[in-house]
Amino acid sequence: MAQGLIEVERKFLPGPGTEERLQELGGTLEHRVTFRDTYYDTPELSLMQADHWLRRREDSGWELKCPGAAGVLGHHTEYKELTAEPTIVAQLCKVLGADGLGAGDVAAVLDPLGLQEVASFVTKRSAWKLVLLGTDEEEPQLKVDLGTADFGYAVGEVEALVHEEAEVPAALEKIHRLSSMLGVPAQETAPAKLIVYLQRFRPQNYQRLLEVNSSKQRPQATEDPDNCLG
């Protein structure tokens, strides 16, 4: 994804007929892929507590998701995705209050920043794109990702990418429309894979996030929190 774009997304629980419905709506299957994501944080989960999500995708590289200006929007979330390593390092140092580490590779600052692996799992994903009927064919297409993690949890994501905050409301309206067409209940919430992983395999970390967010809603990740994490 191009640096600096804003990701607006909603997670949902896909059913056995979701792919067929996407085809009926004119969706195009872009690809099917299998990949491993590894997430990093401090022992205190300082990044997650600050709504920042650092991961390394196998054969793809590093990504840091940071909250957009609006942050969590009901059942939707808005995040900026950083993929340039010097930019990621600068943001990590800012969030963790570290100075003097320069702007080098992410791997080189993991130890100095006290970052360690907190989760790692494999996902099988199908990626779809489509343009809603009644919208400008030249507008950016909506993305729908359907993923199943190797620990058995499946989650879908409807996503739009925009360049500036002023475009977010229109993107949200499209996400609402497509979610409804896919049969997603208006009030449905779906945790990101990372959150379910922590709940099942790192319950102490999950409980820490619950405590931090006790005055807010249950941590939904952004995915990321997914709801930020893919």
UniProtKB/Swiss-Prot annotation:
Annotated CYTH domain ranges read: 5-201
Catalytic reaction(s) noted: thiamine triphosphate + H2O = thiamine diphosphate + phosphate + H(+)
Q: Which GO terms describe its cellular component?
A: cytoplasm
**Record's keyword annotation contains Cell cycle:** no
Recite the UniProt cofactor note for this protein: Binds 1 Mg(2+) ion per subunit.
One Pfam entry for this protein is CYTH
Q: Name one GO biological process term.
A: thiamine diphosphate metabolic process
- Per the UniProt entry, the Enzyme Commission number(s) are 3.6.1.28
Task: Give this protein's Gene Ontology molecular function annotations.
Answer: magnesium ion binding; thiamine triphosphate phosphatase activity
Keywords from the named record = Acetylation, Cytoplasm, Hydrolase, Magnesium, Metal-binding
Binding residue positions for substrate: K11, R55, R57, K65, R125, E157, K193
- UniProt subcellular location: Cytoplasm
- Binding, Mg(2+): E7, E9, D145, E157, E159
The main place the protein resides is: cytoplasm
**List of residues that carry N-acetylalanine:** A2
Question: Per the entry, which co-factors are needed?
Answer: Mg(2+)
Q: Assembly state and interactors?
A: Monomer.
Q: What does this protein do?
A: Hydrolase highly specific for thiamine triphosphate (ThTP).
- Stated family: Belongs to the ThTPase family.
The name this protein goes by in its record: Thiamine-triphosphatase
Protein encoded by which gene: THTPA
